[in-house]
UniProtKB/Swiss-Prot annotation:
One of its GO terms (molecular function) is phosphopyruvate hydratase activity. The gene is eno. The lineage of its organism: Bacteria, Pseudomonadati, Pseudomonadota, Gammaproteobacteria, Legionellales. Pathway: Carbohydrate degradation; glycolysis; pyruvate from D-glyceraldehyde 3-phosphate: step 4/5. This is Enolase. Its EC number is 4.2.1.11.
Length: 422
């Protein structure tokens, strides 16, 4: 299981922007391959995504510098090492970079290598990736958080909240959950058409119409769920990604489509009213990533009612999560491998969350590739929830299809309503 060579290339992500793909070639000839995604709505403390900044090429978004780092320094440092010891490989990658935010080699270069090593190991063992990624956690098939109505930075419309998601918690298993979500997605399209609303899709495959308010978005989803023959609150519940850092300006949160602005306390009351009107079970990034006093209020007021997920707040960083746990901020963390940059550090964040009673939600990015690593990691870690977009665009459905394959291979329970237990 020793590394013969590591090589990288520039490929395109789902938005048509360059990203990096790495091949880890073992002495046996086995090739582990991984590519990395890119976010649009990003936390300020995420690990550094290295771009070329050459305006003459891909509008400055090329990743040839990161590719060269893989082909040169990283290749030289890892040649001859075994992929059996993931922590050692990731430690060497971090030491080689030697910056707090991986800005020297680039988190994209480091992550592509880290994940490709893990995949090479699975191939060497002739085992499915989810099995080799499992570290003793009870594996489950995750509840998909299906982002079928898009706004914010993920869509070119006037909707403030970034993601309106449906969660088929009442399904008996993952394939039925996927079927339920897909049927609702198609019914929603006809509901939108009937009302003369746009049915073009956003970056993550959800519809992105111009509508009058966040409540209207939830009403449209409610109508689609009912018309598809499912029970709102029993079969299907809602989750929101507010991405509030994108709405925060000069001390206030601006809901532009509703012509309203709120301070932290008022926005918490706004959420409380939404929760009393709709079966919302999860709110992600409900406040700005720097508004920690507001987050404490939010957690005190709503933390016993809904899942409060920190994305921009924690950026999959164990150090920042530790601060949040100490201060009683949020009760769940979004897991995005490219926010931290190695598989080992991602695992550390997951373990820290579990050890302190925080939930984990595995997540894609808005700029994705066909790589399905996060589907396997969601199952392996037993996190019970996954965000990987809507029910169209191959970059999104690739992850759902991988989960179907895993479900076929393994007799694993579907997380379902267990995610609601507090």
């Amino acid at each position: 299981m020793h590394i013969h060579k590591i090589q990288a290339r520039e490929i395109l992500d789902s938005r048509g922007n360059p990203t990096i793909e790495a091949d880890v070639i073992l002495t046996t000839g086995i090739i582990g391959r991984a590519s990395v995604p890119s976010g649009a709505s990003t936390g300020s403390r995420e690990a550094c995504e290295l771009r070329d900044n050459d305006p003459k090429r891909y509008a400055g978004k090329g990743v040839q510098k990161a590719v060269k780092h893989v082909n040169n320094e990283i290749n030289q440092a890892l040649q001859g090492l075994s992929v059996e010891d993931q922590e050692n490989l990731d430690r060497i990658l971090c030491q080689l970079d030697n910056t707090e935010n991986k800005s020297h080699l680039g988190a994209n270069a480091i992550l592509a290598t880290s994940l490709a090593c893990a995949r090479a190991r699975a191939l060497s063992l002739n085992q499915p990736l989810y099995m080799t990624l499992n570290q003793g956690d009870m594996m489950t098939m995750p509840v998909p958080m299906m982002n079928i109505l898009n706004g914010g930075a993920h869509a070119d419309n006037n909707v403030d909240i970034q993601e309106f998601m449906i969660m088929p918690i009442g399904a008996p298993d993952f394939p039925v959950a996927l079927q339920m979500g897909t049927e609702i997605f198609h019914v929603l399209k006809s509901v939108l058409k009937k009302q003369g609303l746009n049915t073009a899709v956003g970056d993550e495959g959800g519809f992105a119409p111009n509508i009058q308010s966040n409540r209207q978005a939830l009403d449209l989803l409610s109508e689609a769920i009912e018309k598809a023959g499912f029970r709102l609150g029993e079969d299907i519940v809602f989750a929101l990604d507010v991405a509030a850092s994108e709405l925060f300006n000069e001390g206030f949160y601006h809901m532009y489509s509703e012509n309203q602005k709120f301070d932290s306390h008022q926005l918490i009351e706004y959420y409380a009213n939404l929760i009393s009107s709709y079966p919302i079970v999860s709110i992600e990034d409900g406040l700005d990533e720097k508004d920690w006093s507001g987050w404490k209020q939010l957690t005190t007021h709503l933390g016993n009612k809904v899942q409060l997920v920190g994305d921009d707040l924690f950026v999959t960083n164990p150090k920042i999560l530790r601060e949040g746990i100490a201060q009683g901020v949020a009760n769940a963390i979004l897991i995005k491998v490219n926010q931290i940059g190695t598989l080992s550090e991602t695992r550390q964040a997951i373990k820290l969350a579990y050890d302190n009673g925080y939930r984990c939600v595995m997540s894609h990015r808005s700029g994705e590739t066909e790589d399905t690593f996060i589907a396997d990691l969601a199952v392996a870690s037993g996190c019970g929830q996954i965000k990987t977009g809507s029910l169209c665009r191959t970059d999104r459905t690739a992850k759902y299809n991988q989960l179907l394959r895993i479900n076929e291979l393994a007799s694993l329970p579907y997380a379902g309503k267990n995610i609601l237990k507090r």
